[in-house]
Regions:
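ATP/nucleoside-binding phosphotransfer catalytic cores, i.e., glycine-rich phosphate-binding loops
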Residues: 76-78, 83, 108, 120-199
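Short, solvent-exposed secondary-structure boundary motifs
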Residues: 8-14, 98, 152, 173-178
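Catalytic core of DAGKc-family lipid kinases
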Residues: 1-87
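Short hydrophobic-aromatic micro-motifs
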Residues: 27-33, 82-84, 88-93, 97-99, ...
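Short acidic/glycine-rich loop or secondary-structure boundary segments that cap or lie
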Residues: 38-41, 82-84, 97-100, 124-128
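Gly/Ser/Thr-rich active-site loops/lids in small-molecule metabolic enzymes
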Residues: 47-55, 105-127
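Oxyanion-binding "anion nests"
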Residues: 68-113, 158
């Protein structure tokens, strides 16, 4: 909670429970990581002298209109391979996307799994509509395979993924811009932290 008195009350009276974390090329991550459009926004927002919601909306709109697609190959721990051009890929450990938006509604800090959302290259109007539908009604779907990529959004779970990123799509970890790489390895660390929670 933002209220300091409520926060202190939870610290004093709450209970600790284990939560998962994950690693992105050996960098610690807790909530959400991504490559592509959302990372582009994170990098550009970090460069701004003025912060705040209006700046974030402006940067997001400009980035959406100007950022192209990136070719990637994603391999899961079950050896499924997805080869596609993406607007962005989000790797979620929790369902919070930012500003109370949930891109991965089924994500949990306690299940030992990463939720991966792959937004493929489509026309911009279809992308917006598909992302909004995912935010409002999204559910976990079966792991997508290379032969099943007709939908704009692919949504699946995995303990580990490897992303080939030949065109160096930008990368962020928990909203912070990070130097990208052509090979990105991401894996879950179950019950890595203790977090104080309300009773």
């Amino acid at each position: 909670p933002k209220n300091i008195h409520k926060a202190i009350d939870i610290i004093v009276k709450g209970k600790s429970a284990p939560i998962d974390s994950f690693r992105v090329n050996n960098h610690f991550a807790c909530m959400l990581s991504g490559i592509g459009l959302d990372a582009t926004i994170a990098h550009r927002f970090a460069e701004q002298k003025r912060r705040g919601l209006l700046t974030y909306i402006r940067i997001s709109a400009l980035s959406f209109l100007k950022t192209g697609a990136y070719p990637v190959s994603i391999k899961t721990n079950t050896d499924n391979i997805i080869q596609t051009d993406i607007r962005f890929v989000s790797i979620a450990n929790s369902n919070q996307f930012g500003n109370h938006v949930t891109i991965a509604p089924g994500a949990s800090l306690h299940d030992g799994l990463l939720d991966i959302v792959v937004v493929q290259k489509r026309n911009r109007l279809l992308t917006v509509m598909s992302v909004l539908i995912q935010i409002l009604f999204g559910k976990i779907k079966p792991v997508a395979s290379a032969s099943n990529q007709k939908k704009t959004i692919l949504y699946f779970q995995s303990k580990e993924i490897n992303i080939e990123n030949p065109n160096l799509a930008p990368l962020h970890i928990d909203g912070e811009p990070i130097e990208t790489a052509k090979q990105i390895h991401i894996n879950i660390t179950p019950s890595a932290l203790l977090m104080i929670q309300p009773l």
